[in-house]
């Protein structure tokens, strides 16, 4: 239809394009790629459809399907064509397509109508007929090529050519000193050295060749393989490249390049035979940057576990890679530096038992410091921040695990920045729990400030939208007035914990879910054990059913958490417009306290709901990632 429409357009003539026709909501526009056999079957059916009682049919099964076209001869048979569904944007990310239909108006004028945006593509798979036809064409082409290149000329025939006598060049006078016969001066030592160098590199272990190339610069896998093949690679080593890269290199998800892991730099040899003098100088610079700062990093880490944003931007300890890069514009943000002097050193991310008391007193920061969000299950550490986006026929539905609606399972605003309600409440509950904890209790995980946990999220901190600025205001709410009632709230929380559990340690465990992580709680979440890689369509359907079963609950919890956060955002915006110390300013403070108490009474299970919401977020994102990986594997297997 598209080809016919294009053929009907005339040069030097204008056409009007009508978009957004009414009544077209039930039409899905697809880009169909047919084989020659399928086209011939459709054309045959079109020419004999009045004589054939059956009609063509198409059936979708996930990302695959079956197309049935009736035959004219034999009469009652059909031709089956398998096909698979893919996303047009993934195959051609630089362009997009609209489906245009050419029609004739009542006046006879030609006009164009836009039927919709093409998002999905159907590719019909080749059949045995297609393979047989290709084989016959190849045989015919070979025969024609052979006939053109070979001609038998019989003696006395019409194709006998003229004989051409070729004069021999006169022999040159022999030189009395044959050693002088050298057209250009050559140094054979260079040639021997090059040959020896190439051969010696190809004889080295494949792993050593990989790490010595990655030590100089980052390579993408195809580039690295092409570079290795210059020196010679056998098939066995070529197949083991992926396993070696997983062992010795880190993958940069932005450009899919590989960089050498830090511990492998100790294995490098400066006199590697494949290195030129320039390569050795480059290696010296890399090694001096990698090995020497590691000592400085260890000493500075023992002195101060948290570095300010200024140090993070200028310190050479950080690897100069995209994964650890911190924007220099972060220098002006002083929120981390307030916490630097107030958090005690940690050992592997945990507080020493002797440091618990000091950390307990440090949890409520002063007004100038940022309030770290204590998240029981931080969704920002999802293994799938951007799951594979595969598309099927309902690709516009965000509530399906294979849909494109990644806005439903992103890093949520309430879990990324934290709500002020949680900050205000945990300010007291965490301190109360830590102070009542005996020295011999479980290890405590010291909460890291949000700026250190997520440095990448602040790359564009100076270009924040108004919405992001409002979210940051949550963390900057002044709590001077709250400290006046600290003792009352402390006693209230202590009494609440005592009533909730007869055992003080159990009460601490229940009330401090956000700030405590016992060593026994380091087990994997249940969904990581239950939901493993998908190997069948039945397993995929079960995962999809589980996703849909809990999706509504997740959305409801998410909406409740966001509602709580927005109340305090609004109050904080009012407070910022007032001058400190004024009566209106104090009134807003009182309103914040009242709202805090109101939320606390109306939502006594706030922490449990937030934990459940973040648990569902991680679980659904995990399921969505598995389904996306399975769909991507199936689509690649059809290509």
UniProtKB/Swiss-Prot annotation:
Residues 175-203, 291-326, 378-416, 439-513 are annotated as: Disordered. Residues 470-479 have a biased composition (Basic and acidic residues). The modification Phosphoserine is found at residues 501, 579. Keywords: Nucleus, Phosphoprotein, Transcription, Transcription regulation, Ubl conjugation. GO terms for cellular component: transcription elongation factor complex. The keyword Glycosyltransferase does not apply. Disulfide bonds: none annotated. GO terms for biological process: positive regulation of transcription elongation by RNA polymerase II; snRNA transcription by RNA polymerase II; transcription elongation by RNA polymerase II. Gene3D superfamilies: 6.10.140.340, E3 ubiquitin-protein ligase. Residues 378-401 have a biased composition (Low complexity). Residues 457-469 have a biased composition (Basic residues). The keyword Nuclease does not apply. It is found in: Nucleus. Component of the super elongation complex (SEC), at least composed of EAF1, EAF2, CDK9, MLLT3/AF9, AFF (AFF1 or AFF4), the P-TEFb complex and ELL (ELL, ELL2 or ELL3). Component of the little elongation complex (LEC), at least composed of ELL (ELL, ELL2 or ELL3), ZC3H8, ICE1 and ICE2. Interacts with AFF4; the interaction is direct and leads to stabilize ELL2 and prevent ELL2 ubiquitination. Interacts with EAF1 and EAF2. This is RNA polymerase II elongation factor ELL2. It comes from Mus musculus. The lineage of its organism: Eukaryota, Metazoa, Chordata, Craniata, Vertebrata.
């Amino acid at each position: 239809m598209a080809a016919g429409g294009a053929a009907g357009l005339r040069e030097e003539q204008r056409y009007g394009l009508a978009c957004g026709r009414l009544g077209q909501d039930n039409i899905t526009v697809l880009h169909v790629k047919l084989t020659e056999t399928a086209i011939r079957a459709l054309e045959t059916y079109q020419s004999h459809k009045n004589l054939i009682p059956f009609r063509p049919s198409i059936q979708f099964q996930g990302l695959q399907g079956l197309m049935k076209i009736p035959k004219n001869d034999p009469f009652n048979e059909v031709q089956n064509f398998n096909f698979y569904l893919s996303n047009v944007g993934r195959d051609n990310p630089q362009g997009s397509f609209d489906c245009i239909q050419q029609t004739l108006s009542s006046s006879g004028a030609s006009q164009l109508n836009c039927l919709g945006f093409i998002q999905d593509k159907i590719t019909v798979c080749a059949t045995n007929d297609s393979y047989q036809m290709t084989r016959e064409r190849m045989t015919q082409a070979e025969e024609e090529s052979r006939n053109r290149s070979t001609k038998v000329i019989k003696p006395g025939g019409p194709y006998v050519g003229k004989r051409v006598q070729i004069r021999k060049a006169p022999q040159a006078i022999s030189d009395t000193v044959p050693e002088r016969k050298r057209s250009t001066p050559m140094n054979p030592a260079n040639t021997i050295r090059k040959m020896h160098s190439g051969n010696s590199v190809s004889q080295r272990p494949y792993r050593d060749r990989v790490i010595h190339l990655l030590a100089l610069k980052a390579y993408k896998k195809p580039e690295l393989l092409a570079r290795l093949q210059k020196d010679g690679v056998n098939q066995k080593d070529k197949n083991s490249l992926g396993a070696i890269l997983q062992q010795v290199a880190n993958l940069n998800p932005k450009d899919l390049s590989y960089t050498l892991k830090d511990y492998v730099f100790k294995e490098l040899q400066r006199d590697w035979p494949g290195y030129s003098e320039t390569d050795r100088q480059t290696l010296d610079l890399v090694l001096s940057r990698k090995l020497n700062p590691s000592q400085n990093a260890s000493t500075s880490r023992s002195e101060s576990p948290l570095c300010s944003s200024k140090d993070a931007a200028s310190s050479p300890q950080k690897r100069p890679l995209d994964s650890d890069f911190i924007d220099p514009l972060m220098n002006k943000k002083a929120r981390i530096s307030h916490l630097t002097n107030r958090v005690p050193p940690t050992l592997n991310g945990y507080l020493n038992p002797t440091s618990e008391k000091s950390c307990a007193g440090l949890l409520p920061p002063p007004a100038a410091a940022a309030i770290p969000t204590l998240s029981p299950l931080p969704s920002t550490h999802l293994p799938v921040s951007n799951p594979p986006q595969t598309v099927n026929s309902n690709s516009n539905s965000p509530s399906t695990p294979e849909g494109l609606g990644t806005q439903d399972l992103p890093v949520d605003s309430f879990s990324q920045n934290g709500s002020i309600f949680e900050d205000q409440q945990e300010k007291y509950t965490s301190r109360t729990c830590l102070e009542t904890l005996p020295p011999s209790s479980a290890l405590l995980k010291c909460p890291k400030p949000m700026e250190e946990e997520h440095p990448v999220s602040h790359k564009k901190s100076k270009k924040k939208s108004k919405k992001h600025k409002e979210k940051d205001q949550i963390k900057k709410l002044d709590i001077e007035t709250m400290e006046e009632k600290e003792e009352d709230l402390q006693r209230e929380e202590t009494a609440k914990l005592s009533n909730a559990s007869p055992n003080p340690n159990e009460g601490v465990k229940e009330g401090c879910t956000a700030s405590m992580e016992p060593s026994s709680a380091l087990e994997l979440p249940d969904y990581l054990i239950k939901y493993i890689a998908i190997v069948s369509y039945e397993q995929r359907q079960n995962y999809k059913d589980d996703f849909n079963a809990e999706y509504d609950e997740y959305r409801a919890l998410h909406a409740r958490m966001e509602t709580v956060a927005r109340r305090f955002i609004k109050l904080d915006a009012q407070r910022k417009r007032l001058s400190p110390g004024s009566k209106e300013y104090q009134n807003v403070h009182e309103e914040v306290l009242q709202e805090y108490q109101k939320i606390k009474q109306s939502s006594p299970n706030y922490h449990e709901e937030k934990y459940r919401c973040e648990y569902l977020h991680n679980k659904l994102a995990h399921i969505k990632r598995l389904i996306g990986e399975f769909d991507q594997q199936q689509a690649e297997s059809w290509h």
